[in-house]
Amino acid sequence: MTPTNRHTHGQNAQHARRNAQQSRDAARRKLIAQHAALAEQRARNRRRSDTEQPTSDTTNPAAHSTLPAQRTNAQNAARNAHSTVPEQPTHATTAARARLYGLRLHNTATTDK
């Protein structure tokens, strides 16, 4: 490989890493925005369901949920909050960002408003 080819290859690799980081950051921003939008929708649905009076026609008397009622978005976030993804990717050359799931996603979404 000639010095010119090595230089071009190095520039291409840097460009690819920069594009990957920008794509990753854009995806994180979209994830946080979507989480906030879903939290607002949950709050609207909760308010609406609290104000509506159930009638015997619409309520299923045999319906029973075995899950505890979740009244806040933080409780919803904590319900399924585990990850099997390693914190640092094995063959990555760039620094890994903190994983966003569960309460970490909820806390990030609520502080970025």
Curated annotation (Swiss-Prot):
One of its GO terms (cellular component) is gas vesicle. Its main location: other. Residues 1-93 are annotated as: Disordered. Induction: In PHH4 (a deletion of the p-vac locus) transcribed in all growth phases, maximal expression in mid-stationary phase. An unstable 6kb transcript able to cover gvpD-gvpE-gvpF-gvpG-gvpH-gvpI-gvpJ-gvpK-gvpL-gvpM is detected, as well as smaller transcripts. Gas vesicles appear earlier when grown in static culture, possibly due to O(2)-limitation. The keyword Glycoprotein does not apply. It is found in: Gas vesicle. Residues 52-63, 82-93 have a biased composition (Polar residues). It comes from the Archaea. The keyword Lipid metabolism does not apply. Encoded in a 14-gene locus called c-vac which produces cylindrical gas vesicles only in the stationary growth phase. GvpF to GvpM interact with each other in vitro, and may form multi-subunit complex(es). Interacts with GvpC and GvpO. Proteins GvpF to GvpM might be involved in nucleating gas vesicle formation. A minor component of the gas vesicle. Gas vesicles are hollow, gas filled proteinaceous nanostructures found in several microbial planktonic microorganisms. They allow positioning of halobacteria at the optimal depth for growth in the poorly aerated, shallow brine pools of their habitat. This is Gas vesicle protein I2. The gene is gvpI2.
